[in-house]
Curated annotation (Swiss-Prot):
Pathway: Metabolic intermediate biosynthesis; chorismate biosynthesis; chorismate from D-erythrose 4-phosphate and phosphoenolpyruvate: step 4/7. Belongs to the shikimate dehydrogenase family. Shikimate binds at residues 18-20, 65, 90, 106, 223, 248. It catalyses: shikimate + NADP(+) = 3-dehydroshikimate + NADPH + H(+). InterPro entries: Aminoacid_DH-like_N_sf, NAD(P)-bd_dom_sf, SDH_C, Shikimate_DH, Shikimate_DH-bd_N, Shikimate_DH_fam, Shikm_DH/Glu-tRNA_Rdtase. The lineage of its organism: Bacteria, Pseudomonadati, Pseudomonadota, Gammaproteobacteria, Vibrionales. GO terms for molecular function: NADP binding; shikimate 3-dehydrogenase (NADP+) activity. This is Shikimate dehydrogenase (NADP(+)).
Amino acid sequence: MASQIDQYAVFGNPINHSKSPFIHTLFARQTQQSMIYTAQCVPVDGFTEAAKHFFAQGGRGCNVTVPFKEEAYRFADRLTERARLAGAVNTLKKLDDGEILGDNTDGEGLVQDLLAQQVLLKGATILLIGAGGAARGVLKPLLDQQPASITVTNRTFAKAEQLAELVAAYGEVKAQAFEQLKQSYDVIINSTSASLDGELPAIDPVIFSSRSVCYDMMYGKGYTVFNQWARQHGCAQAIDGLGMLVGQAAESFMLWRGLRPGTKQILRELRKNLEGAL
């Protein structure tokens, strides 16, 4: 790339609605970093070629979103521990020796958002709904917060069992089928994308209590259907995934630039945009 300005991007398909360029442009302005961040829509079979070209042309780093996170994992020359455990990469960085480092900042983004919302994770009982890539990416960061217990539940019980076994070296995680859930939890995290389709998991609402904090990784205008359901059953607090989006972006920015940007103002701006106030 001819420009002297450092180049960053997000790769995905579709990518039109990505908020990453908005977020990282504000991060750069806030921290007085000279950089350009663009959105790149890549053919579903063209990620590796596009990423190679981007870095060959001087690109410094990129984010990776659906459906390329697993391919980015294979593309990276080196992996952080959290990326290796997640089995997926959402952040790539070109190192001084020319190799590409793969990282996964999703779990840290979730934890930082929960802590920013004054959610107590240490000593908490946590229920994680879903056993896909999103769940896999957040388990170790959650275990690092020393909860009393983490239970993974999934429509297909075998997947929950596999995920619990995968992280066993980092801490005990229980696996339960939906129909086995017969108690309430302090923190309930929905890692599935069901809310985007207006669907709810087939789980007994006994999981909710007046002390429960409920977190849906999806977000939209107003409450997600999962958070509406949680509120109807008396949960103390219902949070969507917009703060996780900003948190994982801040962690990526830190990896690239060595500076941790503030997130509160940017989260407020995004929320205004989402609610149609701007």
